[in-house]
């Protein structure tokens, strides 16, 4: 399907496999019109995923420290920088998933996705540089908007929204996440150029 394509600006590697860089992302939740999630629009002028609507996040930096604490520090920092939302402490984050960029892609990330609820009284304040807009979406509504061509979503965001659409509230989702063990997911890219498509473990073609 069209959504199972590499992201805009995501170059396939012609040579040796590159080492993925650690990154952290926050799936920020609130209960408004049912469960809603925050999506931020990357600057359309960005070389990588320009114009795409994504969960706030980014690479782990030296200032974030080491180990799991660094992942949580990076998640909190990126959410603050991109959306202006300050989480009270690292314990506010609940690990949800871990996605590793396909080996065929030149720039790779080992990304941890964390859940968090919007703190009481918090307001959005986008940076206007890396992020140019941010909105709350019911997960299914975001997927429908992408199908209509109104917003651009990339493969990992689509797959997470599909999963989130099965939950009715932030509390239900977080309770589910606390019960599960996070296992890494590493998609594969099959084909090249216009024929390139992404497959997940267990899907036809993954083990070729």
Which residues are covered by each model-predicted region?
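N-terminal leader/linker segments that precede catalytic domains of diphosphate-processing enzymes
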Residues: 1-131, 135-208
């Amino acid at each position: 399907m069209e959504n199972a394509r590499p992201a805009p600006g995501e170059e396939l590697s012609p040579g040796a496999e590159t080492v993925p860089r650690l990154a952290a992302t926050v799936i920020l939740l609130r209960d408004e019109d049912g469960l809603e999630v925050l999506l931020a629009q990357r600057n359309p002028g960005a070389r990588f995923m320009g114009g795409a609507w994504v969960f706030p996040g980014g690479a782990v930096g030296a200032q974030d420290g080491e180990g799991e604490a660094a992942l949580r520090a990076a998640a909190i920092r990126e959410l603050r920088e991109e959306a202006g939302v300050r989480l009270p402490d690292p314990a506010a984050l609940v690990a949800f998933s871990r996605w590793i960029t396909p080996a065929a892609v030149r720039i790779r990330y080992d990304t941890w996705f964390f859940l968090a609820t919007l703190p009481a009284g918090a307001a959005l304040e986008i940076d206007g540089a890396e992020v140019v807009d941010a909105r709350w979406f019911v997960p299914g509504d975001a997927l429908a908007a992408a199908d209509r061509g109104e917003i651009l979503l990339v493969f990992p965001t689509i797959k997470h929204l599909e999963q989130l659409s099965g939950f009715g509230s932030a509390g239900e989702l977080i309770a589910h996440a606390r019960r599960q063990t996070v296992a890494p997911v590493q998609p594969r890219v099959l084909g090249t150029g216009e024929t390139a498509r992404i497959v997940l473990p267990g899907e036809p073609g993954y083990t070729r």
